[in-house]
Every structure is written in C-alpha cells, then in structure tokens.
Amino acid sequence: SKWDVSAVTDMASMFSRASAFNQDLSKWDVSAVTKMAFMFASASAFNKDLSKWDVSAVTNMGSMFSRASAFNQDLSKWDVSAVTAAGYMFSRASSFNQDLSHWDVSAVTNMRSMFHGASAFKRELCGVAWVNSKADKSDMFRDSPGSISSTVCTTSRKGCDEREGEDYEDALLS
C-alpha cells in the first residue's frame, strides 16, 4: 500500500483473477484514474475498505467487482457522477449488500446486468438519479433480490436514508 499511484489513469483489470488478493488499498490516491473496469473482477478474497477513494474522475466501472465474491464494503460516499459505464459492476458479487441509493448515476448509460447474480443484494435503490435514470437496465437485477424503487426515498423507507437538507420531491420536479 506504499505505492504511489497518484498519476495512474487506467487501473482496468489490475487485480482481475487475483483470487487470493486481499491487501489494504485504502490510502491509495486514485483521483486521476478514469478506468476501473474489471479492476477486482474474480478477486474472490478481496474485501477491504475503499470508502475514502476519490473516484470522481472515473468513467468506466464496468465489471469492477464482478465475481468478487467476498466483497461487501461501504461505497455509499463515492462520487460516481462521471461514470457512464456500470454494466456488470457487481455481477455475481455474491456477498455485496451495501446501500448505493444516493449515488448520482445520472451520467450512466449502461447498467446492464449491474447486479446480475448478486444474491445477497437486497436493497431497493430509491435515490433520484436511480429512479429517473434512462440507462440500459437490461437484466440489471437478474437472479438478485434487489430493485429500483418506483418512488424516491423518504426517511421511512427501509434502506434509504434521506440526506439532511435535501428535498427529493423538489428534485424530482426539477
């Protein structure tokens, strides 16, 4: 974890198929990275904290955690507003069950099979960007108990924490 990766822009497939890999990367500066596709795909033992990563420049997270069967870490604070490709992102990530309701997925055009086979994912995604998204959602929750809500989060909705000061009804109308 002492590597200086601050100038790296492409981390696609970096730990793909590294089945025993489970090292701490929490202090990595990934703020310049634009591609994280397949980064942890089939890294079946990986389950470390990435919550403080600055992923605001990333555009491609396709298959990022696909088949990362142990991964179940909080990613709720990630700024994914630049992401356009999220297809298969958590496909067959069989332990993943974190709340992503407040992700800004408004730029995403591909959510195809995003949670396909993510058998532990029991969340109802109810943030404004999820509800209003026009992305390709083919097979998004195939073989997964998760779903996208037909209405926007309120404080009483299980799994959806309303952010303080935000008025989701106004956001829907704007």
PLM features: what roles do these ranges have?
Residues 1-174:
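Negatively charged
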